[in-house]
């Protein structure tokens, strides 16, 4: 499978930082060409410099359908899609903040849905789509019912799209807590509480890494016999 991405074009929306950047980096190392998309031009520029000449950076906003349409028209034909980009807030039933309550679905679910819809006309029939859900689908946290439902919905979307879009392959990943860009930009006290919880409640006794999640995504891109599947790179968290 080491040559599966050789000279393939991989599109990563949310590719300037975090898991998305880790996927883009490994795709380049595997011989692929990557197009990274994000909203922040400065981060995009820096990521493209790091990735080198086999990368292209384009601005895109998954909350804007026209932005997505322009993004994919500019790219043209490509082979694989991964969309980890999302900005949301996790609140409980006691919250009256409608924007925060709906944000997981608006950003994480609908952002990926509309990205896929705009991408499909340009995506090779032998290619793949990998959606990003989360282990909260299998193991909800207190105060995170909507977030858990959103991740479950994304897993269901992946199975449904695998049927609708065949022979294009569609799979989903549901990672657990990852020691990476997202958590490192949160307050240290909250971050350490989350990491300690994960150390105590996962089978491997630690949070994951962005590199480990990227390996999972590249596996799904490269294995031509896997579709309609959901993988839990969560260190066994969902089993405890």
Describe every region a protein language model picked out:
Residues 16-18:
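Conserved glycine-rich cofactor-binding loop
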Residues 30-46:
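Conserved glycine-rich Rossmann-like NAD(P)H-binding loop of the short-chain dehydrogenase/reductase
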Residues 51-66:
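Rossmann-fold cofactor-recognition segment
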Residues 92-93, 97-105, 194, 198:
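Substrate-binding pocket helix/loop in short-chain dehydrogenase/reductase
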Residues 101-105, 109, 113-114, 128-166, ...:
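Catalytic loop of short-chain dehydrogenase/reductase
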Residues 155, 164-180, 226-233:
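Conserved Rossmann-fold SDR core element
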Residues 191-211:
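Catalytic Tyr-x(3-8)-Lys segment
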Residues 206-233, 238:
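C-terminal substrate-recognition "lid" of short-chain dehydrogenase/reductases
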